[in-house]
Amino acid sequence: MSRVKFLSKICFFAALLAIDILAFTPKSPAIIENSWDKANHFLAFFVLYILLYLGYEVKILKNLALLLAFGVQIELVQAFLPNRSFSLLDIVADMIGAAFGVIVVEILKRIYYGKSKASF
C-alpha cells in the first residue's frame, strides 16, 4: 500500500470521527455556529470525497452512495438530539460538496493522466 493511500485512509477516518463529534454534540461549538452552516457541510463532504478517492479509489457512485448514507445518518441522529434537528438542506449541501469533489478529482485525473484515466 502506498504512503498516500495509507495516510488518506487515516485522514478519512479521522475526518469521519471529527465530523461525528461536531454533529452529535447537543449544541454546535461557537466556532462553527454561524451563517456558514451549509458551507461547512459542503467543505466537509468535499474533503471526505477526496480522501475517500485517494484512500480507496472506489467507483464514483459507490463513493457518493457511502457519503450520502453518512450524511443521512448524521441528520437522523440529530433529529433526536436536543438543540439539533433533521435538515434536508444539510444533506443537499453534503452531496453538492461531494459532487464538487468528484469534479475536482476528474479534472486532476485528466490533467495528470490524460483522458484515458478519467471516469467521464
Question: What is each PLM-predicted segment?
Answer:
Residues 19-23, 49, 70-75, 98, ...:
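Alpha-helical transmembrane segments of multi-pass membrane proteins
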Residues 10, 14, 18, 92-95, ...:
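Cleavable Sec-type N-terminal signal peptides
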Residues 55-56, 60-78:
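Membrane-embedded catalytic cores of phosphoryl/pyrophosphoryl-handling enzymes
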Residues 32-38, 76-96:
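Interfacial helix-loop-helix junctions of multi-pass membrane proteins
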Residues 25-26, 56-57, 82-83, 109:
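Short helix-capping/hinge motifs at transmembrane helix termini and TM-loop junctions
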Residues 113-120:
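Short, charged juxtamembrane terminal tails flanking transmembrane helices
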Residues 1-54, 67:
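"…centered on the first transmembrane helix and the immediately adjacent amphipathic helix/loop
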Residues 43-58, 98-109:
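Membrane-interfacial alpha-helical segments at the cytosolic side of multi-pass membrane proteins
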